[in-house]
Amino acid sequence: MKIYTRAGDDGTTGLYFGGRVDKSSDPIEVNGAVDEAQACLGWARSLSETGSPINELLIQLERDLWVLMAEVATLPENRHKLKPEQSLVTQSMIDRLSLEIEMPKEFVVPGENQLSAALDVARTVIRRAERTAVGYAIENSLVVHYLNRLSDLAWTMARWAEGPMHRPARVR
């Protein structure tokens, strides 16, 4: 199988359920930013211990972003891939991890370790994807809501990954 099709040589790309749009169109800009976010989450996952809870969570988040990108690359009448449950799971993970860390009282300087730094990079890329999605105003979709929760989760995961310095004595 060849990786290239030549179909995009004219500056267009195909949508999930048919149709073509310019590669500079809003949905493709959104998906480009989300693709970068997914790659950053993958980088963070590569720095985590294989099989650890954070590693498993990161791979699930990467898979959620596939679903989100399919949602964006679909005509409005076919948007139903991203489910409210995905945002609720993300929110429950924020709540769960928040119990294991002491929330910083000041601004956080990223870079305590490689994993937390990668998660902070992922967070900033996710926030850019969210800003791009807001500008596109995706009708009948949970894309912006999910990206908002995901950026909060990435921030929380980064604080958790910083280690015992941000965890209360009861969980050290």
Where are these predicted regions, by residue range?
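Phosphate/pyrophosphate-binding loop motifs in nucleotide- or prenyl diphosphate-using proteins
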Residues: M1-R172
